[in-house]
Amino acid sequence: MLETITAVNQAVNSFIWGIPAMVCIIGVGLLLSVRTGFLQLRKFPYAIKTTIGRIFRKKDASDGAMTPFQAVCTALAATVGTGNIAGVAGAIAIGGPGAVFWMWCSALLGMCTKFSEVTLAVHFREQNKNGELVGGPMYYIKNGLGSRWQFLAVLYSLFGVLTVFGTGNATQVNTIVTAIDSALLAYGSSLNSILPTVNLVVGVVVAMMVAMVLLGGVKRIGSVTEKLVPFMALFYVVLALGVVVINYRRFPAVLASIVGGAFDPRAFTGGAIGSIFLSMQKGVSRGIFSNEAGLGTGSIAHACADTRKPVKQGMFGIFEVFADTIVICTLTAMVILCSGVPVGYGSAAGAELTISGFTATYGGWSSIFTAVALCSFAFSTIIGWGLYGSRCIEFLFHTDKVVGPFLVVYSFVSILGATVDLGLLWSIADTFNGLMSIPNLMALLLLSGTVAKLTKEFFAGEGAGK
């Protein structure tokens, strides 16, 4: 029975996270780009001006809401995770340096996809009985497509709830304990005997911290993420830029390998990778599944923003993809390629390859800093996905009374993630994560006209100037 479940899950997982999903996500992104006149390119300066340009402006949100900046920080908290460190390394190892080029290409379309998701989420959101703003794919399906499409909203929420415990929590906690264990073992193998106890303590501490943040509601979530996300992003960017600066002589050759390797991977991998398609597949998939454009999850956080202008909040969606993929994922690639560490093209690789890039440049002591970065990324992901799960279960049961018990269970899973190996369950959760894209992409396809209309009205009226 267990073997059958494993086989079925692997088959579905390969399909959902494989070529069909990429084609659908890219296709919808291209359609949305055409219908908005490639807004992500035409209005990119405006997007930066209305996002980064307003970060330091103090603004208080109304009760039950976040400021627009808190909303994007919460979305980034869930998006910028360990995949930015481990996933990029895997893409380069299997797809070669050229995978980075295709990652950039997918991000350009992903910007418009996420812009559309955020715009629709704010436009079709509701206010629950506690006065909190709630929205996301399930709400723009319900309010934008009508009752006959309600089943898609239910499916999205169901897949979301089934995803959060594994993808959003347990795998992230496992990354935290792995990073801490590695840092401890760097000081001597004699510490190996205390690792089980350390893992349990870490799991309990993480569970308590997660519960304290999530049970405080959207105001506390926003307050935490607006402080944590900029810190962890800046910390990682500075650390990675240092690697590039120290190894600046390698930068021109690295850039050439990224562009050239996209079209002739064999020439830059010693013949280990000879397929342009493989390079494209790995780069595009990393871009898509790093910034989550097409999954719709980030729009759940953006729907909490205290704003009356859906399109203006949508600009944060463009910024989010830019920050996640163009900045952070690219810097991870530069750490690996500029440091000169052996990549081992054609073989699987993960966070250890990125860590090797840092240690090759800074020395062994940098393992402490990479552990801090990994822990920060993982913890922020747990917080972001906790919000997503609470919104999904609230939609399924039509009441917020289930949210509290759900968050208690969600927090407890952190202990299991730190101490127990439940690989199959987390693999199934990863499959459900991919399944979330199906109802969301269908909704984006059917509501593409609404996105185009809202965008045109916004930039034609006074809204764009305010």
Regions found by a protein language model. Name each.
Residues 24-32, 36-48, 173-180, 197-247, ...:
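Membrane-interface loop-to-helix entry segments
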Residues 31-33, 106-131, 138, 142-174, ...:
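Helix-loop-helix module between adjacent transmembrane segments
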Residues 38-66, 90-100, 104, 112-147, ...:
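Flexible loop linkers connecting adjacent transmembrane helices
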Residues 109-117, 203-218, 229-249, 285-286, ...:
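Selective recognition of specific alpha-helical transmembrane segments in multi-pass small-molecule
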Residues 117-129, 241-257, 265-271, 304-307, ...:
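Extracellular/periplasmic helix-exit of transmembrane alpha-helices
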Residues 4-5, 35-40, 83-88, 166-176, ...:
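Transmembrane helix-loop junctions in multi-pass membrane proteins
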Residues 59-94, 120-144, 155-161, 273-322:
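Alpha-helical membrane segments and immediately flanking helix-loop junctions
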Residues 1-82, 92-99, 110, 411, ...:
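N-terminal alpha-helical transmembrane segments of multi-pass membrane transport
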